Amino acid sequence: MILVCCATSVFARHTRIYGYVTDSDNRGIELVNVFARCEQQEGTSTNRNGFYELMIECQDTVQLEFSMLGYATVRQRLIRPNEVVNINVELTTETEWLQEVEVRGIQHQTGTLDQIDASAARVMPDATGGSIESILITFAGVNQNNELSSQYNVRGGSFDENEVYVNGIEVHRPLLIRSGQQEGLSFVNPEMVQNVQFSAGGFDAKYGDKMASVLDIEYKQPDRFEASLSASLLGANLYVGHGDSTYSQMHGIRYKTSQYMLGGLSTAGNYQPNFVDYQTYLTWQVGRQKTKDRFAQRQKTNPWTMSFLGNFSMNDYRFRPDSLSESFGGQNARSLNIWYEGQEKDRFLTGFAALSARGKVSREVELGFDLSGFYTHEQENFDITGEYVLSAGGEDSEQSNTHTAEVDPAAGQSQVLGTGIFHQHARNLLRAGVITLAHHGEWTHGRNRLRWGVSGQAELIRDHISEWQWRDSAGYSLPQAGPAMELYYSMRGDSAMQSARVQGYVQNTYRWLTDHGQVSLTVGGRLQWWSWNNEVLPSPRASVVWFPGWKHDFSFRLATGLYYQAPFYKELRDTLTDALGITRIRLNRDLRAQRSVHVVLGGDYYFRAWGRPFKLTAEAYYKYIDRMESYSVDNVRVRYSGKNDSEGYATGLDLKLYGELVPGVDSWISFSAMRARQRLMANGEGLKGEWIPSPQEQRYAFSMLFQDYLPQLPQLRFHLKMLFQDGMPYYAPRNNQSWGRMPMYKRIDLGASYAFNRKTARFMRAESAKHVKQWTIQFEVFNLVGWKNVNSYFWVSDAYNQQWASPNYLTGRRFNLKVTVDLQ
């Protein structure tokens, strides 16, 4: 309350003017120039929804002017305005529109790609420290069940079925990551992002051979100095950008430590995670002379632009577990207590570099060339022993954190169902390198937009894996089959792969007007060849978008195509088990790409409510997958069978309501319903078993991202992220036909931020703060309600050889304080 009162007194002499600029059809107009004149002059422009906001210091009359090419200028006078003034303006056209031109307040979706506001990642509460993925998981059809990870699954697909592009270049992730605790920073640095687009299915042929989704990110090119520095309990970020009319540069350094977050896990111990990331993006426009007249430069044919994108990341994870005490089972309660010895040491080093050249050779033709390389060196080492006691009794873990064992009144002791010792061991080393040379182009002529591309890729991977687990008992808790002690689990292998890929695509978009509205048709195809199995993959794709003439506030789209999930190294690892129970890895040269037929039908409805723009999106989809490769999921590790041994399908409905619940700030709610099933094949001949849930099936999901502020105090904002998702299926060890379902994943993250700038805080006008654009202080509460979410299970057996699944819980309630300084 004291802070609010003080802040109010600071900006009491200023007037905040805000509102919407619309056309005669009540649609917001983007890029309208808004000027306010009094003792000083302030200016701004409207956003894509027609919203504007400015602050001006004035004691008397304010002159307002709204202007845009093609519209009549509107002027208004405010005499001694209040501290907060809302003015909505309607502009009328003063010229005759060409038939082909449409002006819309909210950009209409002309395909399956949806826009994402990257700026929200700076202020949204996020347990990973701030990432684009933290916004993405609130979209319809996108799910995540681990707040420590930036990985996500889309419409029943696995983590590996999602493709990520930065400036048109595909980026890769480390391969050995098995848990969210090991996972470091997302590749994408939100401070460097200009534009983000996402498709949950039915995407165009220009995007690669993945079956689930595409995340397409474009980095910005600053034309002046800008910088930011932020620090919190989860790490620190430093960003610097600079540029002019001929060059630009950006540098970002991020440090993340999740030690504080990991303190809320079920397993007590000494966590030492440290993650560092450096990223740079440099551009240089060849042949352009320096000038301050950027408008004059834009009138000329664009010169060739050279760019370099570089990234280096180091994930260092050390863990020394101490103990675990957990209750589970509800009415048939059980208690599990484990005492650990040993430690885990993991290190993941990843480097990425891309050199690009892009230029217009004519007014209609644009060409581009890319040379990129990716290298990863991953080590995973642990030796951990544990002694466990499984007891009857204990309180339901959903109701209490207190762990007790049932006491036998006659014996006066707990009813111990099983005791034992286990030892987990791993010495895994993987080195992988990928080099890609690509060309792409675009030809725009009339109503046609033709795109094409071709690339060659070389892959070299060496992998050594040695991991096993054995379990012993006191002679009764695990039934003995003989004098020899068999390993509970073992996997060994030394593999090397050297391969080449060639792929290309061509697609054309044709737009035309009919008596029934505007139509946009995109038709294209991809072709890929891989030297490992000599497989050729043809992938035809098509989509059509219709803007009906009878109602400009609607649009409808249909997309379909044949999609392939071309295997990479992880999918190739087939296994053979010998008589001693040791599983050995071999690379399967007969493995074929998974194949999927997609059909996506969707539509958008644009409307205004309470004087503000809204958009309702609905998409129904169906995917049938054959030549499917079954897999299991443990935490975030995906382990494939190495065989085309199953088939499956996914179908569902996604709904999203997007709009401005308060002026100038985006919010949305999403709902998804789906069904994803699979069934195993017997040696590729005939069907075996029944349809069972796919490992990533979540039958329903509700999410919300909400932002709010006080009209009299717009610099104080509140941010809410809410997730309610169906639990993931899980399967008993060595029996993938016996399955259950985890409890619902539910989570509420809340944040509040306060921004200080020259217009709202007197101390920001001091000479010493002239290079400071804004200070932002943010307080966050993760998992506000303190729900205990399950991520995976630890399986133990009692004396009767009955298996029990002890849940591994994720983080509880945590608090975070973050300070951000923006420089200019």
Model region roles, listed by residue range:
Residues 72, 85, 107-162, 166-203, ...:
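Periplasmic N-terminal accessory/gating domains of Gram-negative outer-membrane beta-barrel systems
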Residues 368-372, 379, 590-649, 777-782, ...:
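Membrane-embedded beta-barrel scaffold of Gram-negative outer-membrane proteins
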Residues 46, 432-434, 455, 492-615, ...:
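Structural signature of Gram-negative outer-membrane beta-barrels, strongest in the C-terminal barrel
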